[in-house]
Amino acid sequence: MLVLSRKVNESIKINSNIEVLILEIKKDTVKIAIKAPENIKIFRSEIYEFIIEENKKSILKDKHNIGKIKSLFNHYFKNEN
């Protein structure tokens, strides 16, 4: 992990296409701006964790639903013969 100190209006570059600019420092809060290409997704960590958890729940539901659908197909095709 790289640890840097920056002052207001100073920035860091990540590769050549991402810049993190320090806009404001107040007590225990730092306001930053991130300039990055549109195809780079940027999330606050708590939002990212929420998205991951929701995706996991969705996958579990899908697995359950696929099992139900498979069972219905098997039942249907057994009755066809």
Swiss-Prot record:
The entry's keywords: Bacterial flagellum biogenesis, Cytoplasm, Repressor, RNA-binding, Translation regulation
Subcellular location: Cytoplasm
Gene3D superfamilies named in the record: Translational regulator CsrA
Highest taxon, organism lineage: Bacteria
Record GO biological process: bacterial-type flagellum organization; mRNA catabolic process; negative regulation of translational initiation; regulation of bacterial-type flagellum assembly; regulation of carbohydrate metabolic process
InterPro entries associated with the record: CsrA (IPR003751), CsrA_sf (IPR036107)
One Pfam family of this chain: CsrA
GO cellular component, one term: cytosol
GO molecular function: mRNA 5'-UTR binding
SUPFAM superfamilies in the record: CsrA-like (SSF117130)
Disulfide bond entries: none
Family to which this protein belongs: Belongs to the CsrA/RsmA family.
Physiological role: A translational regulator that binds mRNA to regulate translation initiation and/or mRNA stability. Usually binds in the 5'-UTR at or near the Shine-Dalgarno sequence preventing ribosome-binding, thus repressing translation. Its main target seems to be the major flagellin gene, while its function is anatagonized by FliW.
Quaternary structure (record): Homodimer; the beta-strands of each monomer intercalate to form a hydrophobic core, while the alpha-helices form wings that extend away from the core.
NCBIfam families listed in its UniProt record: csrA
The protein's name: Translational regulator CsrA
Upper lineage: Bacteria, Pseudomonadati, Spirochaetota, Spirochaetia, Spirochaetales
Gene: csrA
